[in-house]
């Protein structure tokens, strides 16, 4: 339960004479992770976004995902940001191949938070660098028992640099 501070201050203005109660917020921190990898052609892959590996207590309230890709012209990248109550072991058995729809076997445990796609354009023979950045509010938050994943389908082999900034309440 949030604590309220009811301190009465002097007259501030004609419309709002006294201060309103201020809800107490727990201290938050930012955790940054950086991953570089190569995606395979026509393959569903994923990465778990987790601030700590040691199992310390935390609650993740929001996350910023930034990715930079080097891809050939005319290629496609679909991505999902999902929340799951249980770990996902096999990406291709949980999500359909080009469209990244959640398969029936894991529908009860997976919640889609955000989705998007990147398409490259340019002249043939030259690689194109594309990037995306997504800021996701997680509502009540994700505790250390839940899992947050970035699921990616790429139409061709491409190099990705993934950076996440997680805002957590410790």
UniProtKB/Swiss-Prot annotation:
- Localization in the cell: Virion
Region ranges (Disordered): 1-25
Tagged with keyword Cell membrane: no
Enumerate the InterPro entries for this protein: Nanovirus_coat (IPR006753)
Task: Give the UniProt keywords, A-Z.
Answer: Capsid protein, T=1 icosahedral capsid protein, Virion
Basic residues biased stretches: 1-19
What cellular-component terms does GO give this entry? T=1 icosahedral viral capsid
An example of a Pfam family matching this protein is Nanovirus_coat
Q: Which family does it belong to?
A: Belongs to the nanoviridae capsid protein family.
Would you tell me the protein name for this molecule?
Capsid protein
Which species is the source of this protein?
Answer: Subterranean clover stunt virus (strain J)
